[in-house]
């Protein structure tokens, strides 16, 4: 019953987003926008976008303390992206953890902690960029919850770091085994392993990843589509669309990402046809290479969606 309700909610979200993105669209004008795209710029921007995936692989290798190797970590990252693009649920992180466990013989706790730090710093990057956008455009109502979100997360980590006994008591009360195992590993790392240099270097890796991601959006909007939005507004569009991409919805966030882009660019006076054309282009730049390469890794590894589902269920017991 719970799965059915979850599916219906996601289906409703996707349907609403698709209706929002395409409702009232003049397809003739939309096609004219597409025809005006700079073909050479599309090629260069597509190649440039791959740098973000390379950076993400380097960051993942750093999180393994340079034990797994850049190639395995790049494959793991692309696999997770590819699985998220085709699977009906957000199984990408599970596939990444499963791949690292298989290739590197890591424990469940270690792979969960690696994925936790990766996603946690991505969340921090997204929240901090959201705060910056809220300040630049004087949207105080958005700034307050975003800032509160960042501070509360770090507050919890501070509690774990400086009050380990209390933190362990809380972890022991968590009813979900997989979450309890992951939190226990995070606690152990905070108390005995990670330190300020670890956080600073991980922050630099994360900043590098997101700067490269943002660069793709800037090139697509300003160079490929010839839309004269200033840099701060393009970055605001990037942040809002990234939130849409992160929402649990359809495989690959199809529909949700496009709606987020149309909404964000509409805030700055960009017409729906131009906004949707850029959204579809950017989405294909993200979708095609990650799906093709990710599925190649998937098939080469002998992995199946059933194995990933089984790994998820075993971890949650």
Which residues does each PLM region occupy?
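Membrane-interface alpha-helices at helix entry/exit sites of multi-pass transporters
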Residues: 72-75, 93-94, 106-119, 270-281
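Short intracellular "coupling" helices and adjacent cytoplasmic loop segments at the cytosolic face
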Residues: 78-95, 102
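Membrane-embedded alpha-helical segments of transport systems
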Residues: 83-87, 112-134, 277-292
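Transmembrane helix boundary and interhelical loop/hinge segments in multi-pass membrane proteins
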Residues: 91-97, 256-261
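Interfacial segments of multi-pass membrane proteins
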Residues: 100-107, 259-274
